[in-house]
Amino acid sequence: MPFGNTHNKWKLNYSAAEEFPDLSKHNNHMAKALTLDIYKKLRDKETPSGFTLDDVIQTGVDNPGHPFIMTVGCVAGDEECYEVFKDLFDPVIEDRHGGYKPTDKHKTDLNQDNLKGGDDLDPNYVLSSRVRTGRSIKGIALPPHCSRGERRLVEKLCIEGLATLTGEFQGKYYPLSTMSDAEQQQLIDDHFLFDKPISPLLLASGMARDWPDGRGIWHNNDKSFLVWVNEEDHLRVISMQKGGNMKEVFRRFCVGLKKIEEIFVKAGRGFMWNEHLGYVLTCPSNLGTGLRGGVHVKIPHLCKHEKFSEVLKRTRLQKRGTGGVDTEAVGSIYDISNADRLGFSEVEQVQMVVDGVKLMVEMEKRLENGKSIDDLIPAQK
């Protein structure tokens, strides 16, 4: 699916009704929120870097969504998008983030000492633990809209900045352009590297332009702390390791992330943040903390139980297949993570994962012994 260049005034020769996209078969947040009135009001506006309403919505027009999975259907091309096109983004954000209002303020908490427990998840069930977030560099357009020069600047800032990390964070940068196909595939299979840009959502939003120019992966020597450069966001920061010690994974995440932010601020390049949206990222689904704390957990009995989806809903968690979003679970191994990004702090979100997964393991053990789990079903968080 090619990226349609929509940055032009030519279409203003046609009325809003003539240009309004056909969203009759769509199941995404953008399609739900976009009315002809909103389209009419916003279609001739653009951000300082030239991103238009049609650029915002194109990925959601081209990808109607899935009957059972509500996708977001819009992206931001720069920091100003969320303000210039707020008539569309505000209802999308409110819908996607459980009623988060335009007047609400987000909270940030990256103090790892505030996490309770998390070092005792049973490694016979919890196979690996991971925490990730995204960060955007102020003053540079986001991946759907950035120029080649901007993208290369992001890469240069990352290479120079990350090279100064020491101790457990000492590592090396590997540009995608010099990697062999076999090396790339190995890193993807090991869950260290982002996939090749085959996702229609990525392609239709313009994020895959000039691939693999300016993209790469940096990781520390232990491969337990990684930074993806110029995929869906300028930076994706990831802390991960085998087993169930989420406390250690979160400690490394918080310490490493603070070090990276200090490096960028020192270079005169802070991250996009405001008190309403928290950290500003490309996809509205990641606003706030941008954090996804996830574990791979083996739950062959619980995953077949009729109450499984109810347990997930009540603990504010979501499940994905073993390989991440849009994949199947292999050998009853699920990727369980926090459903929220906005309105809860980093500590609160990881706490939900720790508490919820601990409960799921307890349920799995009960079911192994043929016992009921009805008394373990939690109240709604």
Swiss-Prot record:
Keyword match Cytoplasm: yes
EC number: 2.7.3.2
MF annotations from Gene Ontology: ATP binding; creatine kinase activity
Any GO CC annotation of this UniProt entry: cytoplasm
Domain Phosphagen kinase C-terminal as annotated: residue spans: 125-367
Reactions listed under catalytic activity: creatine + ATP = N-phosphocreatine + ADP + H(+)
Domain Phosphagen kinase N-terminal: 11-98
Disulfide feature: none
Entry keyword set: ATP-binding, Cytoplasm, Kinase, Nucleotide-binding, Transferase
InterPro entries membership: ATP-guanido_PTrfase, ATP-guanido_PTrfase_AS, ATP-guanido_PTrfase_cat, ATP-guanido_PTrfase_N, ATP-guanido_PTrfase_N_sf, Gln_synth/guanido_kin_cat_dom
One BP term from GO: phosphocreatine biosynthetic process
Entry-linked Pfam families: ATP-gua_Ptrans (PF00217), ATP-gua_PtransN (PF02807)
Subcellular location as annotated: Cytoplasm
Sequence similarity: Belongs to the ATP:guanido phosphotransferase family.
Miscellaneous comment as given in the Swiss-Prot or TrEMBL entry: This electric ray muscle-specific creatine kinase (MM isozyme) is isolated from the electric organ, which derives embryologically from skeletal muscle. It may be involved in the electrical discharge process.
PANTHER family per the UniProt record, alphabetical: ARGININE OR CREATINE KINASE, CREATINE KINASE M-TYPE
Function of the protein: Reversibly catalyzes the transfer of phosphate between ATP and various phosphogens (e.g. creatine phosphate). Creatine kinase isoenzymes play a central role in energy transduction in tissues with large, fluctuating energy demands, such as skeletal muscle, heart, brain and spermatozoa.
Subunit structure: Dimer of identical or non-identical chains. With MM being the major form in skeletal muscle and myocardium, MB existing in myocardium, and BB existing in many tissues, especially brain.
Protein name listed in UniProt: Creatine kinase M-type
Originating organism: Torpedo marmorata
